[in-house]
């Protein structure tokens, strides 16, 4: 399976830097990168999607066409920008913004019906990891049980919560074992990415694991040169 690199800007990128980054990345890449390189700016960092060399996605959207949803953007807004790719289930939205499994399912089902490409994020906390691998498997299985795993536009990103933003990536053995388990659950055509303190130093090794189909990258992608280096490992 072709390897993938995704940049998640979170809420860290200044607006004009984000716009400049997208334009410069477009100049750097080639058409064959379109399905292999994804960028998720924050809402103000999005631009009308005329990019041909990478896929532009949104970090979040409310599961309605439009309406009285103060502070949200909806499918109509994204469609006006010609954006049809969306992150759902990131741990920061699950924990900080209290998005429940039932709401994540509602989001998934709504945007599945719109034929969006969905990057669905899962991952266990440190307490679960310390209970052992059996507990991890049960936790991750529960996170996946309410969504359609045969949806053809699904990508799953495994991000152990204890490794996000901590500069402590999971060990290669942990990634190998966990991805091996998840591959048994997922449709064989569904890409499975790893995220969690990915950086220029460890990206190549992680991509070398057969069951890792790509990377979802946070802070290491915020500098364009770093992201370009990681793309070169694909």
Swiss-Prot record:
InterPro entries: Aldolase_TIM, TIM_sf, TrioseP_Isoase_bac/euk, Triosephosphate_isomerase, Triosephosphate_isomerase_AS. It comes from Helicobacter pylori (strain P12). Homodimer. Belongs to the triosephosphate isomerase family. Substrate binds at residues 8-10, 165, 197. Involved in the gluconeogenesis. Catalyzes stereospecifically the conversion of dihydroxyacetone phosphate (DHAP) to D-glyceraldehyde-3-phosphate (G3P). SUPFAM superfamilies: Triosephosphate isomerase (TIM). Its main location: cytoplasm. It is an enzyme of class 5 (isomerase). CDD domains: TIM (cd00311). It catalyses: D-glyceraldehyde 3-phosphate = dihydroxyacetone phosphate. This is Triosephosphate isomerase. GO terms for molecular function: triose-phosphate isomerase activity. The active site is at 90 (electrophile), 159 (proton acceptor). Keywords: Cytoplasm, Gluconeogenesis, Glycolysis, Isomerase.
């Amino acid at each position: 399976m072709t390897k993938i690199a995704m940049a998640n800007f979170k809420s860290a990128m200044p607006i004009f830097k984000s716009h400049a980054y997208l334009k410069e990345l477009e100049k750097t890449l080639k058409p064959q990168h379109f399905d292999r390189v994804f960028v998720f700016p924050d809402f103000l960092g999005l631009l009308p999607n005329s990019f041909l060399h990478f896929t532009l996605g949104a970090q979040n959207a409310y599961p309605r066409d439009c309406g009285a949803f103060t502070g949200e953007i909806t499918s109509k807004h994204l469609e006006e920008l010609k954006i049809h790719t969306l992150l759902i289930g990131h741990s920061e939205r699950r924990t900080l913004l209290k998005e429940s499994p039932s709401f994540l399912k509602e989001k998934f089902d709504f945007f599945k019906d719109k034929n969006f490409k969905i990057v669905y994020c899962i991952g266990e906390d440190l307490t679960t990891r310390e209970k052992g691998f059996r507990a991890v498997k049960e936790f991750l299985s529960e996170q996946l049980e309410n969504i359609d795993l045969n949806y053809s536009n699904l990508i799953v990103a495994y991000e152990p919560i204890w490794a996000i933003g901590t500069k402590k990536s999971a060990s290669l053995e942990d990634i190998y074992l966990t991805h091996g388990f998840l591959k048994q659950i997922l449709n064989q055509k569904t890409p499975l990415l790893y995220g969690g303190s990915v950086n220029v130093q460890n990206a190549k090794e992680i991509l070398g694991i057969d069951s890792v189909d790509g990377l979802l990258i946070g802070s290491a992608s915020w500098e364009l040169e770093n992201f370009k280096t990681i793309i070169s490992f694909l």
